[in-house]
Amino acid sequence: MKHASSRAPDLLHGPVFSNMTRFFLPIMLGSLLQQLYSMVDAVVLGRLVGKSALAAVGGSDLAIINLVVGFFVGLASGACVVVSQHYGAGEDGAVRRAVHTAILFSVVIGAVMTALGIGLARPILVLLDPPADTLEDSIVYLQWYFAGMIPSMVYNMGAGILRAVGDSKRPLYFLIVCALANTALDLLFVAGFRLGTAGAAIATSLSQLICAGLVVWTLARIPGACRLQLSELRFDRALLGRMTAIGLPAGLASVMYSAANVIIQKAINLLGTDAAAAWSIFWKLDGIYWPVSNAIGITVMTFTGQNYGARQPERIRKIIRTGLGMHLGFSALFSLTLFLTRYLTVRCFTDDPAVIAEGVTIICMLAFFYPVFCCVEVFSSAMRGCGNSVMPTVLTLFGTCLLRLALLYTVTFPHLSNWTIAICYPATWGATSLLFLIYYRFFRWMPGQKPQT
């Protein structure tokens, strides 16, 4: 059943590593292009407007955006799992109903996020207590960013559907177009029209609109069960319930990560504008890692979902082992590259000596800890691909969120410094990885299968 693309890798048969690599590479490149939106905003604002604008879009705003968008991406993963399982099982009717339910759901959620984001931007940012010279820029950027939530949600859901049926290339092509558009619009609105942070946010929202238009146009013309027709846009209550049951815990897990990071951002804000700008630069560089990590997770989840639908548990275990190898190799390479290029990369964002010094110090603190996170991404993605979304959320709650909060209030706030902020990350990654490893090794994580022995 190859409705999506006759050239797509076969997720159910053939060599696991080569097929996963073919599927993963376009997702990775697309994820990096999405991150490029944010990095272009930061470079343009840092160079043309100043460090206050850089701190505004990369600090509190980024923490809030990651929280909200992360929740939807987690929620959308439930739809992708349902589509991939029915696609793997060869159930065209269920795939068709799932696609239309998912797209309609993304429109509704996007509209709600737009209203809440625009209305609550100021009170939420005031609560986070950013440096006074960044507050108004932060509010303007966030409100304009949330104005583009509907196309952003539609694109992410539509691209997820294409990937769920094995087509990871077309979402990449769309993002190439949109990355070029975002760069051109950034220069037009910020350098040309002098709109500052508002111009950067408008450029990002318009780029997301282009992405959404391309993915809807593709789904409306794709042959087979995934074809989108306006007349069939309605909720299938049973499928929506399954999507929510799988996606809601994943969304909550993302919210828990982001909520803890919002509190960390509050601690960073207490250190002043230089520290806020330095951490903002680090987040932009660190932001290169997470899209690739997430791309490996999407690959593992999609392959697992289709093979779970096709009842191939042994192939699922091969997928997990391959995913761990891919993630560990990438993490080690990223850690080394980030450390070796620390001065060069930080100077791309600013010429301010104080900000450069703090940014380089932060990189030295955290660069070599990324491999610790591997088990979290791969095991949680495999479990969600099999429909087990609750336990990954529980493990994330205890290993990451509660422990991170405990460290914040017992170590970070009483002894506030860049070091006590940084230590929260590797400590909680390690704890959560250990919990996932124990659960995978000794418990029944795959519905309908026996635990490992």
What positions do the PLM features span?
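Helix-terminus/linker motif at the lipid-water interface of multi-pass membrane proteins
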Residues: L32, L36-A55, L125-A132, L188-L195, ...
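Alpha-helical transmembrane segments of multipass membrane proteins
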Residues: M39-A42, A115, P123, M157-I161, ...
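Transmembrane helical elements of multi-pass membrane transporters/channels
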Residues: R22-D41, W144, Y155, C178, ...
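Interfacial/gating helices of multi-pass transporter permease domains
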Residues: L45-N66, D133-D137, T197-A198, L239-I246, ...
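Residue-level signal for short hydrophobic patches within transmembrane helices
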Residues: H13, F17-L36, V40, I64-F71, ...
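Small-residue-rich hydrophobic transmembrane alpha-helices
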Residues: L54-A115, S152-P171, A278-R342, F373-T396, ...
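Short runs within selected transmembrane alpha-helices of multi-pass transporters and secretion channels
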Residues: A76, C80, Y145-R163, P171-N182, ...
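Short alpha-helical transmembrane segments in multi-pass integral membrane proteins
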Residues: M1-F24, V83-G148, A184, G192-L248, ...
